[in-house]
Amino acid sequence: MDWYKEPPMWTVDGSTITMRSGPKTDFWRTTHYGFIRDNVHFYYRHVADDFLVEVKVGGAYTALYDQAGLMVRVDEANWIKCGIEFVDGVQQVSAVVTREYSDWSVAPLPSNPAALWLRLTRHGSAIEIRYALDGVQYQMLRLAYFIPSETMSAGLMCASPDGAGFTVTFEGLTIQSK
């Protein structure tokens, strides 16, 4: 696996990957805020055709917009990130679909869970995002069109747009062809 914007601290211990995000890191393009950010920490590998990415993620979210989860990326203007994002003092399950402009959706999670399981699946030109609180009963968060591309990058991301950084743990990362 490779890094796009390696974080200040990261370790791998078996199937557990721990990272500490740097301050002022984010992926965002234009919508509402008028700025472009392209410096999130992204640990990825290249994938082709249809694929599935799964992981369990937990973090010490404290600052507004602290975020961690999964990401797929074709280039700086075409990407999707999903996971937990800390908004209004609450952990939210979050998805941002970007095709030149970012489109963000969130839903509050019950009682700031210690961890969240994420599953992102590519089916042709569609990306399906699901999440579970227990690792078993997955709910759909988003089904989105995504630009056709023979290959793209898929993996883990974390960022701290407003905060000084936070620590996040990913467990059991799976990236497989379908």
Language-model-detected regions and their locations in the chain:
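Extracellular glycan-recognition regions
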Residues: 1-178
